[in-house]
A protein has these predicted regions:
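Sec-type signal peptide cleavage vicinity
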Residues: 2-257
Length: 257
């Protein structure tokens, strides 16, 4: 699936506004194994994140964090898909997932993170995404962020440890303007159009891309719309301000999967 030949359209910003696009790479992130959980883990197997933290929302420096409600999927020894029985309750740099099922036949298992709207190894990249405040990627989980990993059993702790490899592509938008008139405007929507299909359902395939894994499938849509407005009554109900004369993520940084 090609994700790099985008034609960018800004629906709510005049063409004279400066726009800097930064591509965040889908790099491997290390994971930290200091996540805590209060769930009774009897009969469950721990799949832990190692060091330093790996996650599912992205900071401006490319680091990721797990978010509330994130879950992973693993096939057990009987070949049945199992979803983690617990999930983070808030933003955290690390977490210990507890998996139902039996995991004694092998020393390593494939781990799948299909996003919050995905299922098993099926990922849905949303054609309509919403970011309610500047410089946050808390919407990534419902927009199509995803990843796979190989979890390997630790001989000492007997827990499975893994490093999540994110497989989606990300766009970072940094709009600014030197036009005083436009400083009274707000960024409310960004539209990205590609000559390839970039939305709909894809499969996390750990054997693709010479064994490193990849999203496979053809998709079914060529446009993604990112709405950049908060809820009514919130600070950003009118959109993100365009008061900056140079790129400033804190003012109006926007992110798209």
């Amino acid at each position: 699936m090609k994700r790099h030949s985008f034609i960018t359209q800004l629906a709510s910003v005049a063409a004279v506004c400066g726009l800097t696009l930064a591509f965040a790479s889908c790099a491997n992130d290390d994971l930290a194994q200091n996540g805590k959980t209060s769930i009774d883990d009897k009969g469950l197997t721990a799949f832990s994140t190692g060091e330093p933290a790996t996650r599912t929302t992205m900071e401006a420096d490319g680091k990721f964090y797990w978010e509330a409600g994130d879950k992973i999927w693993v096939k057990d020894d009987n070949g049945n898909w199992k979803q983690s029985s617990n999930s983070p309750t808030g933003k955290t740099a690390s977490f210990k997932f507890l998996m139902p099922g039996k995991y004694t036949a092998k020393s390593s298992y494939e781990v799948y993170y299909p996003g919050k709207n995905g299922n098993q190894n099926q990922v849905t990249i949303s054609a309509n995404q919403t970011q309610t405040e500047p410089n946050t990627t808390a919407h990534f989980g419902v927009s199509g962020d995803c990843g796979i990993a190989k979890a390997t059993r630790n001989a000492t702790s007997h827990e499975f440890e893994f490093t999540l490899d994110h497989k989606a592509a990300y766009l970072v938008f940094k709009p600014y303007t030197s036009n005083d008139v436009l400083k009274y405007c707000y960024l409310t929507k960004i539209e990205v159009t590609s000559d390839n299909d970039i939305t709909d359902t894809y499969t996390l395939d750990p054997t693709a891309a010479t064994g490193t894994g990849a999203l496979t499938g053809t998709g079914n849509g060529k446009q993604i719309v990112l709405t950049t407005k908060g809820d009514y009554g919130s600070t950003f109900q009118n959109g993100f301000p365009l008061t900056n004369t140079s790129a400033n993520l804190a003012t109006n940084g926007a992110y798209m999967v």
